Each structure stands twice: as structure tokens, then as C-alpha cells.
Amino acid sequence: MPQNDYIERHIKQHGRRLDYEERKRKREAREVHKVAEKAQKLTGWKGKQFAKKRYAEKVAMRKKIKAHEQSKAKGSSKPLADNGEALPTYLLDREQTNTAKAISSSIKQKRLEKADKFSVPLPKVRGISEEEMFKVVKTGKSKSKSWKRMITKHTFVGEGFTRRPVKMERIIRPSALRQKKANVTHPELGVTVFLPILGVKKNPQSPMYTQLGVLTKGTIIEVNVSELGMVTSGGKVVWGKYAQITNEPDRDGCVNAILLV
């Protein structure tokens, strides 16, 4: 089945334009001027949003540069003043190069990079069209308005979820199609447990479906695994863990998932 990779396939078969690199270089060079022009010309709400976005980008860049500098920094700590007293064993290496901070920073960076890289059981799934996902709901006195949509797939909503007023609710999530628990299988132990769902981490179809909590095949969900008695290396009980849905919940009427360990 195609996975919307026709552009990559075409590049592999026929290659790129001969002037691709030059065009890309020029486009990137022009981008700076476009950003500067937007920063000067945008006013009102758009200007505020743009400034907020730029500020967040600059903060992230500063943090990244600082973390990079810390990982490279290998300075020796200040030696203790010599009072003629013998130093204890654990203070003898104070004058040597201190690499603890550099190692700690590099470990943190690697953890951040690997945070969302799971070897999931289902790396590819079938694409779902909007016509299949949403059903048009006619409203109004003469049923002439069609701005409402009803989700036809199973969804997850939190404990304190409250529907919006009827005249303001654009997307309806039917109560009959809401799921609170999932049949989660542990791949190493080979046991299946009925666990409560804590949230939807990522729906492969679209970020909007993730926000709406739509449960389709391949969706990464977070489940409560406290019943399994799993503990960390530090001895703390693991509360939530990610799992991937392996079935079609709207066809089976239940959610089956495999725990990502």
C-alpha cells in the first residue's frame, strides 16, 4: 500500500534538478530577509504571535548553544587552599580535569534525542481520509448548514472532559465511541492486561487527530501500568508507559495494544 511517499520515490528514480543545490542555497539566503520583513510589517495579533514564536526560537537556540558549550567545557576545579593539613581520599582528585559535567550533559542530550524514537511494532499504517474519519452533521432549522462534523472512529477523552455548548461544538465525539481502557500485551512476559488509558501520545494520521484523541491502528497511547508492579532502577514504581494500538478499534469494538518496552 502507498504511504504518501511519491515525492521520495520520484527523487530516487529520477534524481533532482541540476540546479537544486543552488536554488536551495538562494532560498535559504532569502529566508533571513523575509523573516526581517515580517518582523517589521506584521502588526496586531499576527505581529504578537510572530514575535512570540521568534522569542521561543531564540530561547531554544540559546539553550542549545549553552548545552553545547557545557558539554565541551573541561576545566579543572579550583584547588583547595593548602593549610598544611592532610586531605581526605575523596578530595585528592579535585585538581584533576573535571569531566563529570560534560558527561552528564552529553547523557541528557542523548536521552532527549532518543525520547521519541521507539522501535514500534507497526512502523507503517494505512492512511485514513477525512471522508472516512468525519461524518457531516446537518444543522439549522431547515438542515441547510453543514459546518459540524462527527468523528466515526473510537476516541479517548480525559476524566474531567465536558462538552462545549451545542452551538459552539464543531467536532462531536460520540459517547458510544469513547474508550477508557485497553487490552495491553506485554511482549516479553506474554500476558495481556486490561489497563486504563492515560492519554494519546501520537496519532500517525495527523496532529489534529492526536489532539482530538482519536484511536486508530498504529496510535501511540499512554497506559497506567502500576498494576503490573514495574519498577525503575531506582526502585520507584512506573506509573505510565507507552503502547501502540495493533487493531482497528472501530471494527473490533475494543482497543488492543502492545506495550513498548
UniProtKB/Swiss-Prot annotation:
Residues 64-84 are annotated as: Disordered. It holds the Pfam family Ribosomal_S8e. A motif (Nuclear localization signal 1) lies at residues 15-22. GO terms for cellular component: nucleolus; preribosome, large subunit precursor. The lineage of its organism: Eukaryota, Fungi, Dikarya, Ascomycota, Saccharomycotina. GO terms for biological process: maturation of 5.8S rRNA from tricistronic rRNA transcript (SSU-rRNA, 5.8S rRNA, LSU-rRNA); maturation of LSU-rRNA from tricistronic rRNA transcript (SSU-rRNA, 5.8S rRNA, LSU-rRNA). It comes from Candida glabrata (strain ATCC 2001 / BCRC 20586 / JCM 3761 / NBRC 0622 / NRRL Y-65 / CBS 138). Belongs to the eukaryotic ribosomal protein eS8 family. Ribosome biogenesis protein NSA2 subfamily. PANTHER family: RIBOSOME BIOGENESIS PROTEIN NSA2 HOMOLOG. This is Ribosome biogenesis protein NSA2. Keywords: Nucleus, Ribonucleoprotein, Ribosome biogenesis, rRNA processing. InterPro entries: NSA2_fam, Ribosomal_Se8/biogenesis_NSA2. It is found in: Nucleus, Nucleolus. It comes from the Eukaryota. Involved in the biogenesis of the 60S ribosomal subunit. May play a part in the quality control of pre-60S particles. A motif (Nuclear localization signal 2) lies at residues 51-58. Gene3D superfamilies: 2.40.10.310. Component of the pre-66S ribosomal particle. Interacts with NOP7 and RRP1. Interacts with RSA4 (via WD repeats).
